[in-house]
């Protein structure tokens, strides 16, 4: 399972590809938000409360999914580091 990580001060990001989906998980303190997409990369992005958490919303655009993830963490979207392996997520 390939992984990649990035750090931007108080927010860390971990990208992983499982057998069924790609996951970009952000952590800030004890809060987590995950942007997930199917492995093939053509489905909408799901925003969850962590990798296996409750799905909150689905988006076509990566930017919109990042906005929601940032909101869940209480930061602005610019505070979210995106590992290189995850830069092509979205439709």
At which residue positions do the language-model features occur?
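Acidic, polar-rich N-terminal leader regions of halophilic archaeal proteins
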Residues: 1-91
């Amino acid at each position: 399972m390939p992984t990649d990580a990035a750090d931007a001060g108080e927010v860390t990001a971990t990208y992983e590809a499982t057998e069924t989906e790609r996951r970009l998980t952000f952590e800030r303190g004890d809060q987590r938000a995950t942007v997930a997409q199917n492995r093939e990369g053509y489905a909408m992005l799901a925003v969850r409360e962590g990798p296996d958490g409750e799905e909150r919303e689905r988006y076509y655009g990566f930017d919109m999914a990042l906005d929601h993830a940032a909101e869940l963490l209480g930061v602005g979207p610019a505070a979210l580091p995106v590992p290189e392996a995850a830069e092509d997520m979205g439709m």
